Amino acid sequence: SVQHQDVLIIGAGISGIGAACHLKRECPNKSIVILERRHAVGGTWDLFRYPGIRSDSDMYTFGFNFKPWTEARVLADGDSIRGYVRKTAEEYGVDQKIRFGRKVVTANWSSADNLWHVAAVNDATGETEQYTANFLLGCSGYYNYDAGFRPEFPGEADFQGQIVHPQFWPENLDYAGKKVVIIGSGATAITLVPNMTDKAAHVSMLQRSPTYTLSVPAIDPVSKAL
């Protein structure tokens, strides 16, 4: 059978939850369903668990305008952001609108009936569920959750150590007393380096092009005063 909703949202991360909350506030009579492939709220902030994961933007502008960020830290850690998203979803009741374990496989607009036709696989049953909706919001982000970018390096098969991608950080990875090389100097690398130095014997960063790094306070005195 085909399930119809006024609005279908793909993804229960910060964008999907934010969109659902806005709809709940502004259009309370509209039916909403969130299709989430994974089994947890939070998207990126639930998936990524590497040491020191935090926001790259200040939370006062990154957070929701209808539920302002109230913690003192401007650049919040991943656990705090995940908790913030989950608490917001619960407070506005949109957590009850989420259908976990649904992988959207097709989404097609039909001009004949002016509806979106969406197919999603239920990973618990293996069955493909059919949905129609007046509006479809894609809030799945830009990461490939199955396979983050992973270049192959010549000679890596001869390397006797462990190669780790931050997107798939092993829960019990033990790097204490080991020499670590971090390839790249983007936001993830800048976060990883200082958070690995306490345990690792030595941490080196390799970068292709020089960059500028500016240390900013974790707590903004102006925001704190306000």
Please give the residue ranges for each predicted region.
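Glycine-rich active-site loop/strand segments that organize a redox cofactor
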Residues: 37, 42-87, 210-226
